[in-house]
Amino acid sequence: MASNLLKALIRSQILPSSRRNFSVATTQLGIPTDDLVGNHTAKWMQDRSKKSPMELISEVPPIKVDGRIVACEGDTNPALGHPIEFICLDLNEPAICKYCGLRYVQDHHH
């Protein structure tokens, strides 16, 4: 009995429908990801007239840097920031800090 339950659990984790993919423009239900940014946190906020933190962070334009690696601390004041995260900017699209959500892009001088 327990082995059948374990097999079913393992099988359900392997199915592609149970995987989450955030790199696409729409969800599996066809909802644009931009709608999720506005609605996800807003449902937990008491004052819905204000913008959610996810909406505020998405309005900040990507920060252009010269090098390939950027060190994100979240704020200029270390007491208000987060642990330092080194982000590699090898891709053409902006890289996102996992703590604060700031986006960084390499500034190509071509």
Swiss-Prot record:
GO terms for cellular component: mitochondrial inner membrane; mitochondrion. It is found in: Mitochondrion inner membrane. GO terms for biological process: mitochondrial electron transport, NADH to ubiquinone. Residues 1-22 form a transit peptide. Its main location: mitochondrion. Pfam families: zf-CHCC (PF10276). Gene3D superfamilies: q5lls5 like domains. Keywords: Electron transport, Membrane, Mitochondrion, Mitochondrion inner membrane, Respiratory chain, Transit peptide, Transport. The keyword Protein biosynthesis does not apply. It is a peripheral membrane protein. It comes from the Eukaryota. Complex I is composed of at least 49 different subunits. This is a component of the iron-sulfur (IP) fragment of the enzyme. Accessory subunit of the mitochondrial membrane respiratory chain NADH dehydrogenase (Complex I), that is believed not to be involved in catalysis. Complex I functions in the transfer of electrons from NADH to the respiratory chain. The immediate electron acceptor for the enzyme is believed to be ubiquinone. Belongs to the complex I NDUFS6 subunit family. This is NADH dehydrogenase [ubiquinone] iron-sulfur protein 6, mitochondrial. It comes from Arabidopsis thaliana (Mouse-ear cress).
